[in-house]
Amino acid sequence: MTNVVVVGSQWGDEGKGKIVDWLSERADIVVRYQGGHNAGHTLVIDGTSYKLSLLPSGVVRPGKMAVIGNGVVVDPHALIAEIGRLEAQGVTVTPDNLRIADNATLILSLHRELDAMREDAASNSGTKIGTTRRGIGPAYEDKVGRRAIRVMDLADLDSLAGKVDRILTHHNALRRGLGVAEVSHQTIMDELTSIADRVLPFRDTVWLFLDKERRKGSRILFEGAQGSLLDIDHGTYPFVTSSNTVAGQAAAGSGMGPGSLGYILGITKAYTTRVGEGPFPTELKDAIGEFLGEKGHEFGVVTGRKRRCGWFDAALVRQSIATNGITGIALTKLDVLDGLEELKICVGYMLDGEQIDHLPASQGAQARVEPVYITLEGWKESTVGARSWADLPAQAIKYVRQVEELIGAPVALLSTSPERDDTILVTDPFED
């Protein structure tokens, strides 16, 4: 038995929700360890759809413990609203099935406002990142700047006032520079005191809780958000998120040591998508790109934004295999490729006349690379709902085997529809 870390191996939207839900049935505890409410997913359980963006997937399954780790930035209003939506669907959320790290950073209204103001200003100059405007980046900035308000601060109103003064010294200076009104001390104090009683019951010393559970032999599933190519260090900077999204963050963002992580499962879409700005070497701006987007329902859960679509990029996924230490992948949305006469896979790039096998870190170089493709025969038969290799067309199996060879990692799970049971299990990550 081992613990499992789930990471996206591309730019997010790889289908982590279904796989995490499938794995969470086998887990005792599901832990979010980075990001905020900027990446959503939909779970379908017994015909009911649950849309989650901040809460770990385990919260909707009876008998499971959901944990929000210290690496997550928590918008308390988004948290309360999401709990309310789940309760309206009959899901009970209490400290018996949700814990939040007392040292997790809070997202405040001033973070959301700053995020939006920066994006608006950048839009006018053509340099926008394409954030969700939910305050994620500014909250992480305050965390690193040692001025953040954390969950535990809600329990100590005597010291909270001084911490609010500290954060406002920084933010009001920025607001003056941007030509907008300053935020008053009382506004932030009222904002925090109004939600304290709703958030504090979930507060816990999460690293200690998880350590005790690990020693008891509990199965722990670490649920990543976004994808490895959006990592603040290893992604396509500056078109990235504001946290580390690679598997190593599961240790830092939960308070558990790296030796506790176990199997690293990389969720990998059978083609490539990206939402927002940034380089995308295999992007298809033609009828095939439209086909993938429409058949794959490629619209963001949180923002509703249309995703850009392209061919599978083995060079990029190979990088993610390395930066995450991925043990095996879950290949998703194979069924979206049904009906295409031929398929292409990117195996490397041409950069200034030279072939390279990885995407360079330089923003300028990323903009100049041209993909190098191999072409495979497609298949006409349907793969929808396949639950064994015998159900797959020969060419689909060949495609999967080619992906394995090019990325240097085996397929542990193969998903053939949004339904959780339409999954071919090759290796159970918890039993590895």
Curated annotation (Swiss-Prot):
The lineage's top-level taxon is Bacteria
Sites binding IMP sit at D13, E14, G15, K16, N38, A39, G40, H41, T132, R146, Q226, T241, R305
Q: Which PROSITE patterns match?
A: ADENYLOSUCCIN_SYN_1 (PS01266), ADENYLOSUCCIN_SYN_2 (PS00513)
Catalytic site? D13 (proton acceptor), H41 (proton donor)
Q: What's an example GO cellular component term for this entry?
A: cytoplasm
Q: Name one GO molecular function term.
A: GTP binding
Q: Where does substrate bind?
A: V301, V302, T303, G304, R305, K306, R307
Q: How is the cofactor bound?
A: Binds 1 Mg(2+) ion per subunit.
Q: Which cofactors, by name?
A: Mg(2+)
The annotated pathway is:
Purine metabolism; AMP biosynthesis via de novo pathway; AMP from IMP: step 1/2
Q: Catalyzes what?
A: IMP + L-aspartate + GTP = N(6)-(1,2-dicarboxyethyl)-AMP + GDP + phosphate + 2 H(+)
Q: How does it assemble?
A: Homodimer.
What does this protein's UniProt record list under function? Plays an important role in the de novo pathway of purine nucleotide biosynthesis. Catalyzes the first committed step in the biosynthesis of AMP from IMP.
Name of the featured protein:
Adenylosuccinate synthetase
| Classification of source organism | Bacteria, Pseudomonadati, Pseudomonadota, Alphaproteobacteria, Hyphomicrobiales
Q: Give the encoding gene's name.
A: purA
